[in-house]
Curated annotation (Swiss-Prot):
Recorded metabolic or biological pathway in which this protein acts: Pyrimidine metabolism; dUMP biosynthesis; dUMP from dCTP (dUTP route): step 2/2
The reaction(s) this protein catalyses: dUTP + H2O = dUMP + diphosphate + H(+)
Name of the featured protein: Deoxyuridine 5'-triphosphate nucleotidohydrolase
Molecular functions per Gene Ontology: dUTP diphosphatase activity; magnesium ion binding
Length: 146
């Protein structure tokens, strides 16, 4: 597995992202809060991380949910994955939603999401009158079964 140089700036005193295991694909992002807050069932909130990054051109960062928070508490990300473009320089924010049945307290320094880095290509659109045929055709949205 190779490495990607990513410049990072702490906007507040917050932990730097880190890989939790040797072969982890994503780094954990932590909440950077002046005070803990409660996320009620059905409620969503933009949670700051206190971090900004500079990605090399041709890369994106994907902000994804943490499986443990989803399984144990019903905490998910509204836009998953969230995309951080290579030219974005603002603070990374995580839009959490409580899909569980109980209030959930978000604490300062708590690991709330993970971030994965990926190459990305820009499309060059070629307008045509017809698209090539495939066995699947236009079948979608459950056409192969439940």
């Amino acid at each position: 597995m190779g490495t990607l140089p990513v410049r990072i700036k702490r906007l507040r005193a917050t932990p730097l992202p880190g890989y939790m295991t040797e072969h982890a694909a994503g780094v954990d992002l932590c909440a950077s809060l002046s005070a803990d807050f409660v996320l009620s069932p059905g409620e969503r909130a933009l949670v700051p991380t206190g971090l900004a990054i500079e990605l090399p051109p041709g890369f994106e960062a994907q902000v994804r949910p943490r499986s443990g928070l989803a399984l144990r508490h019903g905490i998910a990300l509204v836009n998953s994955p969230g995309t951080i473009d290579a030219d974005y320089r603002g603070e990374i924010g995580v839009i959490l939603i409580n899909l569980g049945s109980a209030p959930f307290t978000v604490s300062d320094g708590e690991r709330i999401a993970q971030m994965v880095f990926a190459r990305c290509e820009r499309a060059e659109f070629i307008e045509v009158e017809e698209l090539g045929d495939t066995a699947r055709g236009a079948g979608g949205f459950g056409h192969t079964g439940r």
